[in-house]
Amino acid sequence: MKISYSVWKDSKRLKKMSVDLADINIVKSVLARHGFAFSKSLGQNFLIDSSVCPRMADAAATDKSYGVLEVGPGIGVLTSELSKRAEKVVSVELDKRLLPVLHETLCDCNNVEIVNDDILKLDLKKLISEKFADCSEVTVCANLPYYITSPVIMKLLSEQLPLKKIVVMVQKEAADRFCAEVGGKNSGAVTVGVNYYADARLLFPVPRESFIPSPKVDSAVIELTLLDGKRVTPKSEKVFFNTVKAAFSMRRKTAVNGLSGGLCISKEAATAAIERAGLSPTVRAEKLSMEELSRLSDEIGKELK
C-alpha cells in the first residue's frame, strides 16, 4: 500500500528542536532512538557532510520558485538544505522505517513532503503534475544507492518528464562514465544513453568519509541538464538503444561481435549494416559518435525486419 506522508501534518506533536545532522553522534542517537539499523540490501549510506549538502542544494534549486523531487532522503540532511532554497520538496523514500526518523529531523520544514514508495515504480508524470503545480520549474536532487543508479537516472531521462535538470550523487566510477565524451576511451552504453537526453558535467568529488556508514568507494556529484530536443533522431528509439546495448556488450571486441551476439543476427548481417552506415567493419563501439550510432541503428533496423 502506498503511504504519502507529509512532514508538516503532525509536526505539532513534536517539540521543535534544532538537530545537527552533520554531527555523527547526534545522527547515531536519532537512529538508535527509533531502533533503525542500516540495510545493506537497500544500499543505505546516509550523507552527513555539512559541506556537501549545501552545494548540492545550490545546484538543484537555483531559484526559490523551483520544486525539487528528491530520491532517497536518508535522514534528511540534504532535504533540509533543499527546503531552504525551494518552493517545495517532495522526497521519495522506499524504507518505511525512516518515516518516523524524518518526522523528527524535518519537523521544522513546512514545505517538505515524504512519499513512501519505490521511485522505479512510481508514475512520475502524475506525481510531478500533482505535487509541483505551483512551481516554476522542477528539478531532481538525489544521493542514489549505487545499485539503482543507472535505472533511476534512465527512468528520469527517458519518461519525458517536465524536468529542468538532475543533480545526483553517484559512485565516482559511474560519474566518470556518465560524464565521459561519447566516442572517448571511457564511453559506454550509459554514456550514450545519458547524452541522448541531456548534457552531463561533473560538479565535484565527494570522499567516502562523507557518509554513514562509509562506503568502500568515493563518490561524485554530477549535473544532467535536459535537452530541449533529442541530440540525434534515429528512426526507432527502441532499435537505437538495443543497438547501443549490444554494440557495447563486448568492449574488447569489435562492434560486429557485440551486435551479432546481442541482437541474434549473423556477423555477415552486422557487418553489412556497419558498412552501409559508412563505418569500418573493425570499429569498436566506444569509438562511435552519437551520429554514427544513430546511423548504425537505422541500418541494423533493416536487418531486424
What spans do the regions from the language model cover?
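Catalytic cores of RNA-modifying enzymes
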Residues: 1-242, 275, 286, 295, ...
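Surface-exposed charge patches
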Residues: 29, 257, 272
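An accessory alpha-helical subdomain
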Residues: 220, 224-226, 232-269, 277-280, ...
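Mid-to-C-terminal catalytic subdomains of enzymes
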Residues: 283
